[in-house]
Amino acid sequence: MAQKIQSVKGMNDLLPVGQKDFKLTAVFWQAFEDTVNRWTRAYGYQQIRTPIVEQTGLFVRSIGEETDVVGKEMYTFSDSNDSLSLSLRPEGTASCLRAVVEHNLLYNSPQKLWYMGPMFRRERPQKGRYRQFHQVGIEALGFEGPDIDAEIIAMSADLWEKLGIREYLTLEINSLGNREERAAHRAALVEYLTRYEAQLDEDSKRRLKTNPLRVLDTKNPDLQEICNAAPRLVDYLGEASQNHYARFKAMLDGLGIQYIENSRLVRGLDYYNQTVFEWTTDKLGAQATVCGGGRYDGLIEELGGKPAPSIGFAMGIERLLLLVSEYGSLEVNAAPDVYAMHQGEGADLQVMKYAQALRAQGFNVIQHSGYQSLKAQMKKADNSGARFALIVAQDELADGTVTLKDMNGAHGQQTVSATDLTDTLQQWKNA
């Protein structure tokens, strides 16, 4: 027997049933996708779909060459024809904005776009963190004021309500100011951290040289006291940045959205400025961040477009659905309405015709395939979770009748005219 080929470590199959190490099912995932489609339409967002492979330079320019994502986590390879460096996308914003700039989508008006799809990072797989993972992203492009900052947070809070997990999530916010303010803070931060360089771990020492703001994001418990006493970026904000942040917080207060100000919240990508935020939970162990985002007012210009202030966020679907499956609520209905079975010569063709007619009227129908006893077919109908069973027997073909059974028992089992089949099922379903 040939050796089985396994899936790549950290990249999961999504199956009709849960697995030992990955309990999410395809039907649960699809129910979430349906919810997201309704949710984004309600806020006026249009979907965009981009390739999973992009030029590596896109992410170097947008995310930052010295970030962990670009430096250590991307899957990068060369195109064999022209040696062009390509990468599997590690996040969705850069690809979305590349498409916006390439196709001039901001020519006439601002855009509200959303996407959903797989991303890839070479990380150590663990619960809630995978090498292929999926994100839903929201991007509001060409909007300058703090009102859109507050709106997208209210939008995310609305989704948490729909999923029944609002009480398990905490909103953390911060302001990163503008480029000049960050530069002044960076100088003070480097001076401060250099005094403690001997106490820093290797990762923080590397970040001190490449991206010192990210040192504040360390999870090392031995460094928390040092980081807590570090210069705060909020103390370096100018009047315009302070006003933007204050108006943003006032809007959250007015909307009744509670938040925690976290002066060490910096996010892991270099393109952020002004407002940044994360939704976190204590229900998923180390993988606390479920959703995060912020402003990236200079990114579109950095990618070759005209300046356009923008903001967005992304949520990890696997991590979010792990939380929903444990603590939330998501209406999932994978069971068919009808399991159609047949018995005797000629009944197999007739049941196929009835099944097609029912599907045309909006019923979900599983048609039994093969030639088993009625008892065996009924067992499969029961296992399918179908609400109703349709039985077409050879001796009923001549008089044009069928047998219907309510698997829940409410209407029992009845013989009805084939012409009344759809109406009877509709009445039973609505009862």
Curated annotation (Swiss-Prot):
The keyword Nucleotide-binding applies. It is found in: Cytoplasm. Its main location: cytoplasm. The keyword rRNA-binding does not apply. InterPro entries: aa-tRNA-synth_II (IPR006195), aa-tRNA-synth_II/BPL/LPL (IPR045864), Anticodon-bd (IPR004154), Anticodon-bd_dom_sf (IPR036621), His-tRNA-ligase (IPR015807), HisRS-like_core (IPR041715), HisRS/HisZ (IPR004516), HisRS_anticodon (IPR033656). Its EC number is 6.1.1.21. It catalyses: tRNA(His) + L-histidine + ATP = L-histidyl-tRNA(His) + AMP + diphosphate + H(+). Keywords: Aminoacyl-tRNA synthetase, ATP-binding, Cytoplasm, Ligase, Nucleotide-binding, Protein biosynthesis. It holds the Pfam family tRNA-synt_His. GO terms for cellular component: cytoplasm. GO terms for biological process: histidyl-tRNA aminoacylation. One of its GO terms (molecular function) is histidine-tRNA ligase activity. It is an enzyme of class 6 (ligase). It comes from the Bacteria. SUPFAM superfamilies: Class II aaRS ABD-related, Class II aaRS and biotin synthetases. Belongs to the class-II aminoacyl-tRNA synthetase family. Homodimer. This is Histidine--tRNA ligase.
